[in-house]
Amino acid sequence: MKLGVVGLPNVGKSTLFNAITCAGAQAANYPFCTIEPNTGVVAVPDKRLDVLAEMYKPEKYTPATLEFVDIAGLVKGASRGEGLGNKFLSHIREVDAIVHVVRCFEDDNVIHVDGSVDPARDIDVINTELVLADIETVTKRSEKAAAMLKKGDKKYATEKEAGEILLAHLNEGKPARTAALSEDQRAVVQDWFLITMKKVIYAANIGEEDLGKDENELELVKPVREIAEGEGAQVLVICAQAEEDISQMDPEEKQMFLEDMGIGQSGLDRLVVLGYKLLGLISYLTAGPQEVRAWTITAGTKAPQAAGKIHSDFERGFIRAEIVPYEDLVREGSIAACKEKGLVRSEGKEYVMKDGDVTLFRFNV
């Protein structure tokens, strides 16, 4: 699963990405500084793993991860291929959800591509380009569906209906994800790969002078919240510059800095956790002296498919899953103690995995 980081030039997108991955993507003060997408794999913060590591003292510690892609800066006209438009559109189609970085800080030293700071306008610029790209896609698919219907292929009826609803919706400047589609219609348009069907986190990038202030009172953040509420999108207030500085600190220094600022968790950690949830992901855990590990699965995954994340043989020869909830294991102190109290459950092929299940799979091939 991938999260694409997008934004107009000079809004702090590459600075945020540097902080996310410590990858050092060039954050130059001019448009088009990042042409190819940089990709970074980030650990998902999970205190449960730290507790299990203390219990088991494992040789290996492996957290769940999330992939972020820094997508080239966008300008007006991208949907027509202007600027880096064609590259932008191809890269953004490949991600599963979008982190849209919005500039919510004033700084005379950082040029704004439109000459002034206006979060609502910036959001509209990018969203308009994405909507225009989707209109082109939907128009082509609708025309194809209509042609196939004329030839008597009735299976295209749902596609045609969905296309009509989507075109009317997109032409109002609204994202595809908020269109009133039936389940059947939503299913048939999945392989249209519409950009505005993807879920969005608006990362409101504030200046360091606004750190520690009431986020709800920040004037430049208010329009971002209003737009997000109308779309059913998420908002995360973050200071990319501070996060880049924090990302270069050692763990103790980072903790002291966060405590001094009165912050429980860094903005980046909150972004990663929010992204994980937005993608509908959960973690089951495995623990022992060799390794403590979080395994990423989609919510609703059944035990055999979860086992397949470890190895295909585990799924093919699945017998059962021995499961103890994380809270029970920590309270009792060991799997043996949990077994004595009857807290270890044996689950079969239809069991739907839960976040925090500490699991041992039994299989035979």
What are these regions (language model features)?
Residues 1-111, 140, 145:
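Conserved G1/Walker A P-loop phosphate-binding module
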Residues 2-6, 17, 144-352, 359, ...:
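C-terminal-of-GTPase-core extension/linker across diverse P-loop GTPases
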Residues 6, 32, 37-40, 47-49, ...:
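Short capping/connector residues at structural and topological boundaries
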Residues 32, 46-49, 62-68, 82-96, ...:
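Amphipathic alpha-helical transducer elements in NTP-driven molecular machines
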Residues 40-45, 72-82, 93-156, 169-182, ...:
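Conserved Switch II/interswitch segment of TRAFAC-class P-loop GTPases
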Residues 92, 353-354:
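Short, well-ordered loop/turn sites that connect or cap secondary structure elements
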